[in-house]
């Protein structure tokens, strides 16, 4: 029961720090004097880092077990959320948000692993996963409420500090209650290895390409700015190399292509890609009037 409460709270906090930040972003932009061209980065860098490192950190959890990756992710998140509240300029805030983005990449896959190991296949397990998913929108709306309340009644800094306090309490509880599965994982997954070529192509490819697309609209010469062209081309080359590595080189790829073999899986992935992309655009621009 304690494990379930911990992972539900973790899911809630993950969405809390996405939705709520967009609410306080206008006030943060004024307080830290963020130039218009950089206002998108404190909001987007968090999700960018999470998405880029999700697969490598998930593989680390496969090798060393979910317990340590999950709990250390919570500790890391608590630290950098607390630091973000003390930001004195927008560069410090962007760095804190970027480093904090590594934490969801750690506990997103491990929460699924922990729940999967705890419950046997069947209706009860399906219900547990359904409830877990339901806490994402709950955390989303809590983030909006707390973000608005702190910006109006306190200061935007308390949005981060309150979140870090809850994260710290969740860290302590997880250390005391979640069973350590490292020894078990080392035995069960003794043959599992890190796909280093996948890491070296997927991570920089996602980061460089997303940076070029995001920053191109605010660069001095738009998408014709030299550094935008260079980063975009490099990102595409890295992603193309990642497709080749994952499909024909890696013995244990981070993203096996057979994941997309089930009927409609490829179409579902494409539709979710565009759905989340459009939602992110709406969420950002809805914060500014």
Q: Where are these predicted regions, by residue range?
A:
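Hydrophobic transmembrane alpha-helices of multi-pass secondary transporters
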Residues: 2-15, 42, 46, 76, ...
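Extracytoplasmic
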Residues: 2-37, 41-44, 52-54, 107-108, ...
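Conserved extracellular-gate-facing transmembrane-helix segments in secondary transporters
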Residues: 10-24, 205, 209, 213-217, ...
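C-terminal membrane-cytosol helix-exit motif in multi-pass small-molecule transporters
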Residues: 164-184, 203-215, 234-249
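Helix-loop-helix hairpins in multi-pass membrane proteins, especially solute transporters
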Residues: 56, 60-197
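Hydrophobic residues within the alpha-helical transmembrane core of Major Facilitator Superfamily
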Residues: 12, 48, 82-83, 98, ...
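12-transmembrane solute porter fold
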Residues: 6, 22, 226-227, 252-289
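Flexible interhelical linker loops that connect adjacent transmembrane helices
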Residues: 175-203, 218-224, 248-262
